[in-house]
Amino acid sequence: MLRFFSIALLLLCFSNANAQPFPFQKGDHVSILGNTLAERMQHHGWMETMIHSRLPGHELSFRNLGFSGDELTLRLRSSGFGSPEDWLKQTNANVIFAFFGYNESFAGEEGLPKFEKDLDSFLKETLSKKYDGKNNPRIVLFSPIAHENIKDPNLPNGIENNKRIDLYTKAMAKVAAANKVFFVDLFTTTLNLYSVSEKPLTINGIHLNEFGDKLVAQIIEKQLFQNEGDKKDAAFL
């Protein structure tokens, strides 16, 4: 019971770098880009559910374009698959959720200058487009989650990995602020969640299980909405 209370309290008491809630608009088409964290979110659907519960009258649509291994400048696809821009146009994206930074973090501290430059270019270029044919998109940039130590002798404990992810999360926050882009720090909050949860949030330290997916969705919900607005229950939806 104490651990459950600690998790609930922690979800309420996170820090938020954004001054205002994210400005969703009725009929928004949300396209989700990024690495395995983004791709695996389609398995349980908690993030979309949490957002719909806040905005049941907005008629939002979500399209998951996440792809394992994706980086800002490296997105391997079969020939004829179409470019990232093609798919953002096909989905009429006017809101983009971008999950990057984990794969890039393996370049270490020496890779930070290139990463910051690539991220700045990605944000500026993306913000300049009109994928829905009318408006420049609004972006939410998400940091990687922390690496969880699930105490399996066959898996790394995540200490070195988290040092790198921490550096890249801070770099992402800086670049997002410079471009006036909404930023969600998943690293710091998940690192704290791991310490108070009695159950693992991941299957292997880095990929969320359903319990972890739900808690991360709650983090995202609270950062996007900053506890403003009514939340509808499952029966209403």
Regions found by a protein language model. Name each.
Residues 24, 45-63, 70-237:
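Alpha-helical cap/lid subdomain in secreted, periplasmic
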Residues 29-42, 68-73:
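Catalytic nucleophile-elbow at a beta strand-turn-alpha helix junction centered on a G-D-S/GDSL motif
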Residues 17-21:
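Boundary at the C-terminal end of the N-terminal hydrophobic targeting segment
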Residues 4-13:
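Sec-dependent N-terminal signal peptides
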Residues 12-15, 51:
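Structural signature of transmembrane alpha-helix termini at the membrane-water interface
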